Amino acid sequence: MPRRSFNGATVLVTGAGGGLGRAIAEQFAAAGAHIVAVDKDAAAVASLQATLEARGRACLSLPCDVTDPDACARAVAAAIERFGALDVLVNNAGMSHRSGLADTDLAVIRRVMEVNFFGAVHCTKAALPCLIERRGLVVAISSVAGYTPLIARTGYAASKHALHGFFESLRTEVAPQGVQVMMACPSFIATQIDRNALGGDGLPVRHAQVTIGRPLTADAAAQQIVAGAARGRRLLLVGRTAWLAWWVSRLAPAVYERLMARRLRGELESGTNTVRTTERKPRP
């Protein structure tokens, strides 16, 4: 498969206000793409636009809540109006939680699913006609939690597993029309997503995140993602930890579960925000 060039392409990145999304936008811009930076934080994407324009790159920043399908449709329409086309959609917007299910309000899990899964669905649905016309590319930012279990993040893992089912099925629908779909699965990244994670009561968690392996920088992960997109990768495991998790979880799933739980179980026991509504009575 020939290497895809992004020079002159229009790339829409959700969650582009900071962290991995901003780094992805900067990497695509460095490859010559026109950037449409979408984020709920209007000031953050306006800052990115100013940075890219100072480098001589074209960028349109748009405030957008990806949980609103109409807002996603307006963002896609604005991108096409400004640049005449849309070639690449990067579904990066996301959030996390850190709490055991027993201590998690169901509204937290619904919120995570709305942002991580339905946000990607909304944007992809809106962009699909233009992507088909342009024989474009959809990138879905998943996670190691998209193909393995992850303790204390049941809702987050469910949202990432759902992305795989959705986009791998979509690939079979749009491949005949020349549209490519890439799943990118980073391991832990040093960004705000886990610093802003919700606890079981929907408030920001108060305890520090536990990681496996050395967290990637956003720039390092973004470089791999853009390079993988150019090569036409279907599945991109980003970072050594992601590769190890993939193989161990498939060759020895029970071993993987024990190792992962041993490392991360402290997140269930480190003073998470709690939403228990009943008290366990001591045995007589």
Question: How would you describe each model-predicted region?
Answer:
Residues 10, 17-18:
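Conserved glycine-rich cofactor-binding loop
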Residues 31-48:
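Conserved glycine-rich Rossmann-like NAD(P)H-binding loop of the short-chain dehydrogenase/reductase
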Residues 42-43, 63-74, 106:
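The beta1-alpha1 cofactor-binding region of Rossmann-like NAD(H)/NADP(H)-dependent oxidoreductases
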Residues 100-101, 105-110:
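Substrate-binding pocket helix/loop in short-chain dehydrogenase/reductase
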Residues 124, 159:
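Active-site helix of classical SDR
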Residues 143:
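Residue(s) in the substrate-gating loop at a strand-loop-helix junction
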Residues 176-240:
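SDR active-site lid
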